């Protein structure tokens, strides 16, 4: 099929790798393939360097030191597929070469020590933890550094905050009090800053000289009594203020202050904090602490420059300004590598504590590095992070786009971050610095709005964690090929033009240019422009960039369209959209859902399970295909060959399509012929009418695979057994089980059918003499077992497509304590579209299928072509998502011309271009009509006459010309399939791309007749998972009261709910065909009485004659 490209803006640079934020970050943290001597001081290398050397405490017997030399990462013991199958973690062993040094004897023992396992990242950027694919979401937080903010309590005053890395030191606030005294607040204690400045060696003369420009403010800082002290005295005085309970000793004070401000192991601004502090204060720092300790004295790094800036800000000196904490120059991303390294550091600190204890306890002569180190604390810390952290999430694998989006998510929640309840509007809002860095459209709709966002398409995260976006350099009005990646802070210094600025060659073509400076729009001469956007795509995330004509959609609906694409279910007959945006191929390629050729070569073998290619370098590579694998969300992951034997392939050519891809293009739904018109109220309120033909052609059929699992345990009564020998079951019920009691592959199973047979021993009383006799004759066989088999849950079923049996003792199998074996059965369902399923397009138009019409009843074109879907026109104006109408018009042209289109966002097809294509399509369509011998009939002319009155067509023109005018508007005359008559007015018809979403009615439909009850309230449980009932709430009670339906209401509140005795009596009566008796007391009333009695209130129930009634009488025996 021919692909026609729109778009006038040349792509200067390709998109960066889409999973780079995950893959590169983790690679850098591990540095597994870097020789030890060339490793940078980042990630786990930095964690080792910070923790080691570990020295024996003061109380030690002789001085022992454990030092670190290098580490290496071994090979993973199991493949990724084995890990998924056996519920293992995809990980590799970590070894460290350590030295134990005896200080007094100089003896050195060296050893390679096993430090546990380190989870490895798969090539697509996710992890396999306990058999499940997981993603570590990047976290955005306030960067460490020095910040100046207005004091909310006192206008015109400011607070300077010095913020370290999370959990790597205290926050420090400096402020000028109302009295003029400059105070410092640390660990919730406030003291005059001059005290610390004296400890740092400043005297009155120096302070006056350094701060002479701020006369009045300096007077509030100076305290002659303090400045007359020696630094050591000031240090002890400061220590007594910070630790009032501790004895004021010089050595204690020194150790405390060193740990608080100068110890690199306990206080750390981080590289990003150091960079931000230097940038803000205009000074160079020697390290990442606030104070350095040299020759027994403290030397200031940060405090005086911070104070100078605070004074300048208070005095209103130009060039000094407060910080915007939501500016992306002040917020940074903590990627997976940093998050893991932080946790690794925590684990190493616990390990070091254990090492110190063993140094003290053990004999120095017999100790070795291996005896000192216990790897458990480190492994536990990593396990905790990967399996339980708020940022470690179950991977969304609904379709390839979902998994890619999940890896590019940025969350402000999580440890050290915000909470939903505390986050205000400012932090959630779109900020001007989001431009090209964080998508302004894609974010969840609920409580997490604005807290969870997505990385923009071209954005990259730099080594310090700041998000950079690319710009082309402009010199004297000429756009160069030089591309510069800039942080938000750097961008604020320049004037930047938009990507769609008109160019003649490389020169800006207009004499005035719309540009922006610090986020504000300005109109400037071409010579003033310093940079230019690389592409309109750079503003939005991947999902949003997949919406054609995005510029015509309201942002609220674009948000829904972005989010709903990730909920699209892969269909068995996937179709790429007729109207694309140009990113569809790249998404499939970077998600690794499809298979591509590694080099140039020739295909030598193709079958349903593998593709073999002989590459030109002589290698014969077999590429295995994943067929009908279950994704985390239960959708089918299936790869289908797209090459033939003997076919020549080039490097990067498509070998096999993955789920939701067609010829390597993302294919989340189907292109269907849509009419936008009301239809007898069946499409009221976003409901959708579809043609039965879609079901016949399997257009919206998807495969879903459910996983069922059962364990056989060792119990106190005896072991549970997986067996076919189940008591009290007919042979018919067991017909699909093999001799081991597991259902065969290919069997069709329905609700209640047995998947895995299991028997468990019954709990029993003391056996009777007769039973004991039988047991002695027949052995243990007579002991009673009960059927505890795994059955298909209500409302589920399908075809058994896989089974797996894991036994304790099998290689690589790790089962929970007490579990002897686990059996898993995979059941696949082929789901056709049905009434109640949710459909949506890319523009945020979503609805539920309300009616499936026979194809003969669907509206049809004059040539008899029936439409596939009828959408309500009222779904468009109020939602303001007109992009879908333009897509439909362009789709109509594509339908007749047999073309596909690429229309990039903010640079797509214009109205004149669409009209031109529609004119071409009309000539083809009408020429075909005339060729088949039918022109414009009488009924069509009536519709045209009405259209003329509405001003849709020009009066006085021939019917053919009027039809062409309508076609230029994307409208045609449509006939009612039920009556054969045309509808009154012309109707918009065209191809629209519509997806079936994960919210399928089959998963939500639920009915209960008899089921489980809650133990305390004796009311039916709630929800489909518990096989619960429908809640009859207070509003439903009001409805029955309003109707006066007293008996129905009484039944609802008693025997249908929690009246145990009444329930049983009613059951008996129905069986015997008698009248249902009067209800008794509901259990919830008894619970209420008991709760009141528990509050020491005397509650009595009386009859009409005030005689006491015991509502608990005989209850124990009846239960």
Swiss-Prot record:
Catalysed reaction equations from the record: RNA(n) + a ribonucleoside 5'-triphosphate = RNA(n+1) + diphosphate
GO molecular function: DNA binding; DNA-directed RNA polymerase activity; ribonucleoside binding
SUPFAM superfamilies to which the protein is assigned, alphabetical: beta and beta-prime subunits of DNA dependent RNA-polymerase
Pfam families from the UniProt entry: RNA_pol_Rpb2_1, RNA_pol_Rpb2_2, RNA_pol_Rpb2_3, RNA_pol_Rpb2_45, RNA_pol_Rpb2_6, RNA_pol_Rpb2_7
Biological process according to GO: DNA-templated transcription
GO cellular component: DNA-directed RNA polymerase complex
InterPro entries per the UniProt record, alphabetical: DNA-dir_RNA_pol_bsu_ext_1_sf (IPR042107), DNA-dir_RNA_pol_bsu_external_1 (IPR019462), DNA-dir_RNA_pol_su2 (IPR015712), DNA-dir_RNAP_su2_dom (IPR007120), DNA-dir_RNAP_su2_hyb_sf (IPR037033), RNA_pol_bsu_bac (IPR010243), RNA_pol_bsu_CS (IPR007121), RNA_pol_bsu_protrusion (IPR007644)
Top-level taxon of the source organism: Bacteria
E.C. code: 2.7.7.6
Family label: Belongs to the RNA polymerase beta chain family.
Function statement: DNA-dependent RNA polymerase catalyzes the transcription of DNA into RNA using the four ribonucleoside triphosphates as substrates.
UniProt name for this protein: DNA-directed RNA polymerase subunit beta
Organism: Thermus aquaticus
Gene: rpoB
């Amino acid at each position: 099929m021919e692909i026609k490209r729109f778009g006038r803006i040349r792509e200067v640079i390709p998109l960066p790798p889409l999973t780079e934020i995950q893959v590169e970050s983790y690679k850098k943290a591990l540095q597994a393939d870097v020789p030890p001597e060339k490793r940078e001081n980042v990630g786990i290398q930095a964690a080792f360097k910070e923790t080691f050397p570990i020295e024996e405490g003061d109380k030690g017997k002789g001085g022992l030191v454990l030092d670190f030399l290098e580490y290496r990462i071994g090979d993973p013991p199991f493949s990724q597929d084995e890990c998924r199958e056996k519920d293992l973690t995809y990980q590799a062993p970590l070894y460290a070469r350590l030295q134990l040094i005896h200080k007094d004897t100089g003896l050195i023992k060296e050893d390679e020590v096993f430090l546990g396992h380190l989870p490895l990242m798969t090539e697509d950027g996710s992890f396999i933890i306990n058999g499940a694919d997981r993603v570590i979401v990047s976290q955005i937080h306030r960067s460490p550094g020095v910040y100046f903010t207005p004091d909310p309590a006192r206008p015109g005053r400011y607070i300077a905050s010095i913020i370290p890395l999370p959990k790597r030191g205290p926050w420090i606030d400096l402020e000028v009090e109302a009295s003029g005294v400059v105070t410092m607040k640390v660990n919730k204690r406030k003291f005059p800053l001059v005290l610390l400045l004296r400890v740092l060696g400043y005297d009155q003369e120096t302070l006056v000289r350094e701060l002479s420009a701020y006369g009045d403010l300096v007077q509030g800082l100076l305290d002659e009594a303090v400045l007359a002290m020696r630094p050591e005295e000031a240090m002890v005085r400061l220590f007594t203020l910070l630790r009032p309970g501790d004895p004021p000793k010089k050595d204690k004070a020194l150790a405390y202050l060193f740990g608080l401000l100068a110890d690199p192991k306990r206080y750390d601004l981080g590289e990003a904090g150091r960079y931000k502090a230097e940038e803000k204060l205009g000074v160079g720092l020697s390290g990442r602490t606030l104070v350095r300790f040299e020759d027994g004295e403290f030397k200031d790094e940060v405090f005086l420059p911070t104070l100078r800036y605070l004074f300048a800000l208070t005095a209103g000196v130009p060039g000094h300004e407060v910080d915007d904490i939501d500016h992306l120059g002040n917020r940074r991303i903590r990627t997976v590598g940093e998050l893991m390294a932080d946790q690794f550091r925590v684990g190493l600190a616990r390990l070091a504590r254990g090492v110190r204890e063993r140094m003290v306890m053990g004999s120095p002569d017999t100790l070795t590095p291996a005896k000192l180190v216990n790897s458990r604390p480190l492994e536990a810390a990593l396990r905790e992070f990967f399996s339980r952290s708020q940022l470690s999430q179950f991977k969304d694998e609904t379709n390839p786009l979902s998994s890619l989006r999940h890896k590019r998510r940025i969350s402000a929640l999580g440890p050290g971050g915000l909470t939903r309840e505390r986050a205000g509007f400012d932090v959630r809002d779109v900020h001007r610095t989001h431009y090209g860095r964080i998508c302004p459209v894609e974010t969840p709709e609920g409580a997490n709005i604005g807290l969870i966002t997505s990385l923009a398409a071209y954005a990259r995260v730099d080594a310090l964690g700041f998000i950079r976006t690319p710009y082309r350099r402009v010199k004297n009005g000429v756009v160069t090929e030089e591309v510069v990646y800039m942080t938000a802070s750097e961008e604020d210094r320049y004037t930047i033009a938009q990507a769609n600025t008109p160019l003649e060659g490389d020169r800006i073509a207009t004499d005035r240019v719309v540009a922006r400076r610090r986020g504000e729009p300005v109109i400037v001469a071409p010579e003033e422009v310093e940079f230019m956007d690389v592409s309109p795509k750079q503003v939005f995330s991947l999902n949003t960039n997949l919406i054609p004509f995005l510029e015509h959609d309201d942002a609220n609906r674009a948000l829904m369209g972005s989010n709903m694409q990730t909920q699209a279910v892969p269909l068995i007959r996937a179709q790429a959209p007729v109207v694309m945006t140009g990113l569809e191929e790249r998404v499939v390629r970077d998600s690794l859902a499809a298979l591509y050729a590694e080099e140039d070569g020739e295909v030598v073998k193709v079958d349903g399970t593998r593709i073999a290619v002989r590459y030109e370098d002589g290698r014969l590579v077999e590429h295995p295909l994943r067929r009908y694998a279950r994704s985390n969300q239960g959708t089918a992951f299936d790869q289908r060959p797209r090459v033939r034997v003997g076919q020549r392939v080039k490097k990067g050519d498509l070998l096999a399509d993955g789920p939701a891809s067609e010829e390597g293009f993302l294919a989340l739904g189907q292109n269907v012929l849509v009419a936008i018109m009301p239809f007898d109220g069946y499409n009221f309120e976003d409901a959708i009418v579809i043609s039965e033909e879609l079901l016949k052609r399997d257009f919206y059929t998807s495969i879903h695979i459910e996983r069922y699992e059962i364990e056989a345990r060792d119990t106190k009564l005896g072991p549970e057994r997986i067996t076919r020998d189940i008591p009290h079951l007919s042979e018919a019920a067991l017909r699909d089980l093999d001799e081991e009691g597991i259902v065969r592959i290919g069997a069709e199973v329905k609700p209640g059918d047995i998947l895995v047979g299991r028997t468990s021993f019954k709990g029993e009383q003391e056996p009777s003499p007769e039973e004991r006799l039988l047991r002695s004759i027949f052995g243990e066989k007579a002991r009673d077992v009960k059927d505890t088999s795994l059955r298909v849950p209500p409302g589920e079923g399908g075809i058994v497509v896989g089974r797996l049996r894991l036994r304790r003792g099998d290689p690589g199998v790790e089962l929970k304590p007490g579990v002897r074996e686990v059996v898993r059965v995979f059941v696949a369902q082929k789901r056709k579209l049905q009434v109640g399923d949710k459909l949506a397009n890319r523009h945020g138009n979503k609805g539920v299928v309300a009616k499936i019409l026979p194809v003969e009843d669907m509206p049809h074109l004059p040539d008899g072509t029936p439409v596939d879907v009828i959408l309500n026109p009222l779904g468009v104006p109020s939602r303001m998502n007109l992009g879908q109408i333009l897509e439909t018009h362009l789709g109509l042209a594509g339908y007749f011309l047999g073309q596909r289109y690429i229309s990039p966002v903010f640079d797509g097809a214009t109205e004149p271009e669409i009209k031109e294509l529609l004119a071409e399509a009309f000539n083809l369509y009408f020429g075909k009509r005339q060729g088949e011998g039918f022109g414009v009939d009488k009924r069509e002319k009536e519709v045209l006459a009405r259209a003329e009155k509405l001003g849709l067509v020009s009066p006085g023109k021939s019917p053919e010309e009027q039809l062409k005018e309508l076609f230029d508007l994307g409208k045609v005359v449509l006939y009612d399939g039920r009556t054969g008559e045309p509808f009154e007015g012309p109707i918009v018809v065209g191809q629209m791309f519509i997806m079936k979403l994960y919210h399928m009615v089959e998963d939500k439909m639920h009915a209960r007749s008899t089921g489980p009850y809650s133990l305390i309230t004796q009311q039916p449980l709630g929800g489909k998972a518990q096989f619960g009932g429908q809640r009859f709430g207070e509003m439903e009670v009001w409805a029955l009261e309003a109707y006066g339906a007293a008996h129905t209401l009484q039944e609802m509140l008693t025997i249908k709910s929690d009246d145990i005795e009444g329930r049983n009596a009613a059951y008996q009566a129905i069986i015997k065909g008698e009248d249902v008796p009067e209800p008794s007391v509901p259990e919830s009333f008894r619970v209420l009485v008991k709760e009141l009695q528990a509050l020491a209130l005397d509650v009595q129930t009386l009859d009409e004659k005030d005689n006491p009634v015991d509502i608990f009488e005989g209850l124990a025996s009846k239960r």
